């Protein structure tokens, strides 16, 4: 079992800059004492997300389920089927009732809106721990 590195990379995708800022602020620079310091990668389009994930090095991807024109849940499902080393994927959902859609997307975890800092940091920290301790992420 390996420990989380001192520096981790978290991608946040939303077409809305304010949503990306809310996520970054809620999760913070280090979501828990035992996780690495986050290097944030922001993406405003699905093409940017695809390019970043193809490049590799992303530990956790946070995808806005309400993003336009391509929502994060569809992207999550696509990545789970297409990427051999898919990072942990967290989907941001606007309604708790959309939890079934997040399950369909094969997301590893969800963050509900309104974005709550303690919950958001805990979700990201757990995914970072899982990523670096060999616990497999959900696969399609």
Put a short name on every predicted segment.
Residues 115-124:
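C-terminal output helix
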Residues 94-110:
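Alpha4 helix (beta4-alpha4-beta5 surface) of REC/receiver domains from two-component response regulators
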Residues 132-140:
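CheY-like receiver
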Residues 7-28, 61:
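Conserved acidic segment of CheY-like receiver
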Residues 59-80:
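Conserved phosphotransfer microenvironments
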Residues 83-88:
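His-Asp phosphorelay/catalytic-motif detector in bacterial-type signaling
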Residues 43-60:
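Acidic, metal-coordinating helix/loop segments flanking the phosphotransfer/catalytic sites
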Residues 35-44:
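Short hydrophobic/Thr-rich beta-strand motif most characteristic of the beta2 strand and flanking loop
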């Amino acid at each position: 079992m390996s420990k989380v590195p001192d520096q981790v990379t978290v991608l946040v995708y939303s077409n809305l800059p304010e949503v990306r800022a809310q996520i970054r602020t809620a999760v913070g620079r280090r979501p828990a004492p035992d996780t690495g310091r986050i290097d944030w990668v922001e993406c405003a389009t699905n093409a940017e997300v695809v390019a970043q994930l193809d490049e590799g090095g992303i530990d956790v991807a946070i995808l806005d389920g309400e993003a336009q024109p391509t929502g994060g849940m569809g992207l999550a499902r696509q990545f789970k089927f297409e990427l051999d080393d898919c990072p942990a994927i967290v989907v941001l959902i606007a309604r708790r009732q959309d939890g079934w859609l997040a399950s369909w997307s094969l997301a590893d975890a969800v963050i509900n809106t309104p974005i709550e800092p303690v919950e958001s940091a805990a979700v990201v920290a757990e995914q970072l721990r899982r990523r670096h301790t060999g616990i497999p992420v959900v696969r399609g």
